[in-house]
């Protein structure tokens, strides 16, 4: 029995996939805490799909896909900030416009050059077949993101929580927003290998949303989100070996199940807890 349970660890490709998914899940969850605080979930969705044209162009010209995806994500984020700053359009309208435009452009590029582009890798990811050079890329991206987040997490918190107060203490909202979107784009690029373009949004939203239901303290929220992201990344890869299912699908399903548990049974915000309090108040 023990040998059966330890079987996935005997394969090098499984070991690589587990540790990469753990790192990606943890860092994406770190950023998801800020998306919850600011109410920017839709931006995470937009960036996760906006990298598709960058990946398609990179594949078409035999360039590192991470390079194309990163620059496409940065371009999308800067476009959102720029259009919002010069127009009277609401934020959700700008995000929806950029998201649909970039995604449509990506599909167009794929349709024009289908033979050179592995659509399945873009959509579903390919963590079990990840090459060593891609592992190094992801590891470097995650390390840089982690270091920058640990250095600037308090400044980002102030910018997201009270922009006016941040300006009075000498912080530049534009600089920190660009920094955040750069980090988010980098994490989306890394997560593409793990779960693919379609499910990236779950990794940058669900852990933060789950933690948001469990605590009112932001520092604790970050810790819970990172733990959930890392653990589901590791366990998801492990379980996918036995389920013979898509790794990204298993990871996101685990995150969704944990969210549903928090949604129902969170001590303060859970649906069951709220109904119990109403019954007590009524009595």
Region annotations inferred by a language model:
Residues 2-16, 87, 94-154, 282-283:
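Transmembrane helix-bundle core of multi-pass membrane transporters
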Residues 50-60, 97-109, 129-130, 173-178, ...:
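Small-residue-rich segments of transmembrane alpha-helices in multi-pass membrane proteins
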Residues 198-249:
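Transmembrane alpha-helical segments in multi-pass inner-membrane proteins
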Residues 33-115, 212-223, 242-243:
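Short loop segments and helix-boundary regions at transmembrane helix junctions
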Residues 245-252, 256-283:
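Cytosolic-side transmembrane-helix boundaries in multi-pass membrane proteins
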Residues 13-25, 61-75, 139-143, 189-203:
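Structural signature of hydrophobic alpha-helical transmembrane segments
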Residues 147-180:
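Membrane-helix/interface signature in polytopic inner-membrane proteins
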Residues 17-20, 66-71, 92, 96, ...:
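Loop-to-transmembrane alpha-helix initiation sites
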């Amino acid at each position: 029995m023990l040998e059966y349970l330890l079987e996935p660890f005997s394969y090098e490709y499984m070991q690589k996939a587990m540790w990469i998914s753990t790192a990606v899940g943890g860092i994406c969850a770190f950023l998801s805490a800020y998306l919850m605080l600011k109410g920017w979930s839709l931006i995470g969705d937009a960036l996760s799909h906006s990298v598709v044209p960058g990946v398609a162009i990179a594949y078409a010209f035999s360039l590192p896909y991470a390079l194309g995806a990163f620059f496409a994500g940065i371009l999308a984020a800067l476009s959102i900030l720029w259009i919002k700053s010069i127009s009277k359009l609401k934020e959700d309208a700008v995000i929806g416009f950029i998201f649909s435009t970039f995604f449509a452009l990506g599909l167009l590029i794929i349709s024009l050059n289908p033979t050179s582009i592995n659509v399945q890798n873009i959509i579903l990811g390919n963590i079990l077949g990840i090459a060593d050079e891609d592992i190094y890329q992801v590891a470097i991206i995650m390390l840089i993101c982690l270091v920058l987040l640990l250095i600037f997490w308090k400044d980002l918190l102030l910018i997201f929580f009270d922009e006016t107060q941040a300006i009075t203490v000498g912080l530049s909202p534009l600089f920190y927003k660009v920094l955040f979107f750069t980090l988010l784009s980098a994490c989306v690029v890394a997560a593409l290998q793990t779960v693919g373009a379609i499910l990236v949004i779950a990794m940058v939203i669900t852990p933060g949303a789950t933690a948001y239901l469990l605590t009112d303290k932001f520092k604790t929220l970050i810790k819970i989100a990172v733990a959930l992201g890392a653990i589901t990344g590791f366990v998801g890869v492990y379980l996918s070996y036995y389920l013979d299912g898509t790794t990204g699908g298993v990871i996101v399903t685990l995150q969704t199940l944990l969210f549903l548990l928090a949604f129902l049974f969170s001590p303060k915000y859970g649906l069951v807890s709220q109904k119990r309090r109403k019954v007590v108040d009524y009595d």
